Amino acid sequence: MSPVSTNDWVERRISLRNKHHLHMRPAQRIVETASRYQAEVRAVKDHLDLSAKSILDMIEFAAHMVNRASQDDNEFVFRARGPDAQQALDALDRLVEERFGLE
């Protein structure tokens, strides 16, 4: 098997399970977690493809997810590329699984 280029995107499908969906505190924790890694990390849903390292982008993303929550549509994708892309996605997956440490 050949190694994956650091320019290739790695994706992780995420399903929100916390009762309040995304709001300011989870958005902030996403930014804090993603910012620990060199990889470019993005949150993708519908027409949005936003930086997971930008609090303004994550607030916009959270607002979009809240609007989708009324339709029981709580899935989105984190994608990353760079030298530690897989580690960044693993950390974000753990963060979501732990419900952002808020429940």
List PLM regions with ranges:
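C-terminal structural segments of small proteins and small subunits
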Residues: 66-103
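Compact, glycine-rich, soluble single-domain proteins
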Residues: 15-66, 71
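Non-catalytic helical/linker scaffolds that mediate oligomerization, partner binding
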Residues: 11-19, 75-79
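SAM-dependent methyltransferases
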Residues: 1-11
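Residue-level detector of functional hotspots within protein domains
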Residues: 8, 27-29, 86
